[in-house]
């Protein structure tokens, strides 16, 4: 999805990616997963890597065990290339392996393999 955003005082055209992933059905694991994604606990190398591959903004929402992630990128962003590169950056594989404890995903899977793209089925824009 391409959208226009105001960044500072400039208008920017961006792509938006929406993805989903399920967590294991364990209140303790979910609480720990939330903690690990807090500003105080997130690994700096992971945040730096996300920015380094060109991701402008990322948000993750949760409902029960279901995660919903919104990623905004420049319009010339190539998802597959960026995710391949991200997987080679410092501590990324270690982070993914650690996160697999909480996620309904097999150990050794990359972020791109775990998070499933969602299809937009409705939109309403102001005209």
In which residue ranges do the predicted regions lie?
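Short, well-ordered beta-strand segments in beta-rich or mixed alpha/beta enzyme
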Residues: 17-22, 56-89
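Short amphipathic alpha-helical segments
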Residues: 29-54
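Single conserved hydrophobic/aromatic residue that forms the stacking wall/gate
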Residues: 1-8, 13
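Short glycine-/aliphatic-rich beta-strand segments at the starts of folded cytosolic domains
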Residues: 14-32
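Short, conserved, surface-exposed binding loops centered on an aromatic residue
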Residues: 10, 52, 59-61
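An amphipathic, aromatic/His-enriched active-site/gating alpha helix that lines ligand/cofactor pockets
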Residues: 53, 74-114
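Eukaryote-biased recognition of C-terminal alpha-helical segments
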Residues: 114-122
């Amino acid at each position: 999805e391409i959208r226009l955003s105001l960044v500072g005082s400039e208008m920017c055209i961006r792509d938006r990616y929406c993805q989903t992933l399920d967590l294991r059905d364990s209140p303790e694991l979910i609480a720990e997963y939330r903690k690990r994604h807090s500003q105080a606990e997130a690994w700096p190398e992971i945040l730096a890597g996300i920015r380094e591959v060109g991701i402008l903004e990322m948000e993750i929402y949760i409902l029960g065990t279901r995660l919903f992630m919104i990623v905004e990128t420049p319009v010339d962003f190539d998802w597959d290339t960026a995710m391949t590169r991200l997987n080679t950056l410092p501590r990324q594989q270690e982070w993914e392996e650690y996160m697999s404890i909480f996620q309904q995903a097999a150990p050794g899977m990359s972020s791109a393999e775990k998070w499933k793209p969602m299809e937009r089925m409705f939109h309403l824009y102001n005209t």
